[in-house]
Design a protein with these regions (language model features):
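Active-site loop of short-chain dehydrogenase/reductase
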Residues: 24-28, 40, 81-83, 121-123, ...
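Glycine-rich "substrate-gating" loop/helix at the edge of Rossmann-like oxidoreductase active sites
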Residues: 58-62, 90-104, 128-140, 176-178
């Protein structure tokens, strides 16, 4: 439903950004996504790779909506001096995530698989070879990064992050700067859940992009870095997962 998806996302962000502008909001932070970048990017992915290649077809509608939001913020700043900035987060996880069996992201999907397999004393089958590398950041780190950006990132200052041509960047990547293979991720989750059964890898299923890691050096130059390591974040997320089951608030 790419048309519906694109229409809804464009309406939401345009309404919010335009309303913020018209009502003299002092500063606006727009959140994009790492899917804005071309599917065949060099790694790690720098901000200036935006619009340098073809988008991943499965995420195209979402990516176009996010790119539109970035460019609208840029245009309002340029034409009207509206103070709007944007952050591009890496893959997020944490409390309130989506644990649906077919449309959840890889980390919450693995949490559900291993949790249910432990309770039912069954095996776990994961897609692909497990070799692709991905970056994951806890949502609490993103919250901290957003506050930091609003308080510390001044695009007009002499030390504002710039692209290779010396132009101030209007959006910055935010992440951990570290990636991990899907197989390693699965083993960490299995260990935290204390799953003792067998794990199989269905190599007939696609692996997807081999690596996707954001270059977060520009945001790091401002003095921010992630604080929650992956094992700690997974442990916290497992606690919220169990609590959401008990309180019947789990998104499935």
């Amino acid at each position: 439903y790419s048309a519906d998806f694109l229409l809804e996302n464009l309406k939401i962000e345009i309404n919010l950004i335009e309303s913020s502008f018209k009502n003299n909001v002092r500063r606006l932070l727009f959140l994009g996504s790492s899917c804005i970048y071309p599917k065949a990017c060099n790694q790690p992915i720098k901000e200036e790779y935006l619009l340098n290649g073809e988008l991943e077809s499965t995420n195209e509608a979402y990516a176009i909506a996010k790119i539109t939001g970035i460019k609208l913020c840029e245009s309002l700043r340029k034409q009207y001096d509206f103070d709007a900035i944007s952050l591009m987060p890496t893959n997020l996880y944490g409390p309130g995530d989506n644990y649906h069996q077919t449309n959840s992201h890889v980390l919450p999907s693995l949490i559900r698989k291993f949790s249910e397999a432990k309770k039912e004393n069954t095996t776990v089958t994961c897609w692909g070879t497990g070799s692709p590398l991905r970056e994951f950041m806890h949502v609490d780190d993103l919250g901290d990064a957003c506050v930091f950006a609003l308080e510390k990132w001044d695009m007009e200052s002499n030390n504002a992050p710039r692209d290779s041509k010396g132009k101030p960047l209007s959006f910055l990547n935010v992440g951990t700067g570290k990636d991990i293979s899907i197989k390693e991720l699965a083993l960490i989750i299995a260990a935290e859940i204390k799953f003792k059964g067998e794990i199989f890898w269905d190599v007939t299923k696609p692996d997807g992009t081999k690596r996707k890691l954001l270059d977060v050096n520009k945001f790091s130059e401002l003095g921010w870095e992630s604080k929650i390591d992956l094992k700690e974040g997974i442990k916290k997320t497992l606690g919220s997962y169990e609590n959401e089951i008990i309180t019947k608030n789990l998104r499935i």
